[in-house]
A protein has these predicted regions:
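Short, small-residue-biased leader/transition segments that mark boundaries at the very start
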Residues: 1-9
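N-terminal low-complexity or amphipathic/hydrophobic leaders
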Residues: 13-79
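Structural motif
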Residues: 28, 38-39, 57-60, 97-100, ...
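Hydrophobic, well-structured mid-protein blocks that either form specific transmembrane helices
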Residues: 105-141
Length: 234
């Protein structure tokens, strides 16, 4: 639809701007000022490589611990399927979306090389998982942005399944809705709720540009106190 394509163009422009000028610290500062004090994912969710960046819309995925019960009965046919709905979730990724997964115990890998390859075909922006990732050499070779607890090969197949996607999820107390904007860099991952994104990014750009001026002044010899009193930035 025309509306859909206009939104895509607007998102593309916004994402380009975020990657060029913004970073998690300045975006987080603005959300703090606006009273949104719990928008950072926990600090152990880190990029697989320090220079990896993510900016894109959340495609939320709900995982749960499920003992591999394909041989047993049970009342939910979904749980008889390998990986549950993971393959459907992966195939549903759209351009500039981020596969973000939470809900399970942090005891196994929720992302890997083949998932990265498929996500790249969908033109996804990256993956953020509340757990480990594996096939690390392969993911790094693909240069696909992945944020996780780090490398650990123990697989989800006999331990967990995707039970739903494009539903609200929680990552250590941080609510993530499908379509929220996710920004990730070496300092972590922050979640910008869609309803406040316009104000957040407008103010973050202003602050980022101000910070560059303050940096220049400090490098020219200005004292920290004077810089803060004059610019209100530190």
């Amino acid at each position: 639809s025309l509306v859909g394509s206009e939104m895509c163009i607007r998102d593309r422009t916004l994402i380009t701007l975020i990657k060029a000028e913004l970073y998690t610290a300045v975006i987080g500062d603005i959300m703090d000022k606006m009273g949104y004090l719990h928008q950072f994912l926990p600090p152990h969710i880190r990029p697989l490589r320090d220079d990896m960046l993510i900016a894109g819309r959340a495609m939320t995925v709900l995982e749960a611990d499920v003992h591999d019960n394909s041989a047993s009965g049970g009342n939910n046919p979904l749980l008889q399927r390998s990986f549950g709905l993971m393959l459907e979730a992966l195939d549903d990724l759209k351009e500039d979306e981020v596969y973000i997964c939470s809900g399970s115990s942090p005891e196994y890998a929720l992302w890997g090389e083949l998932m990265s390859a498929r996500a790249m075909q969908c033109k996804a922006a990256g993956a953020v998982v509340n757990g480990y990732s594996r096939d690390t050499k392969g993911i790094l070779a693909l240069d696909f942005p992945c944020f996780s607890y780090g490398p650990y090969a123990q697989d989800q197949a006999p331990r967990g399944k995707v039970i739903d996607y494009r539903v609200p999820i929680e990552v250590d107390g941080v609510l993530v809705n499908d379509g929220d904007m996710l920004i990730g860099d070496i300092d972590g991952v922050c979640v910008v709720p869609r309803r406040i994104e316009e104000e957040v990014f407008t103010r973050a750009l202003e602050k980022a540009r101000g910070e560059r001026i303050v940096l220049k002044k400090i490098q020219e010899g200005m004292r920290a106190r004077d810089a803060f009193d004059k610019f209100g930035i530190m």
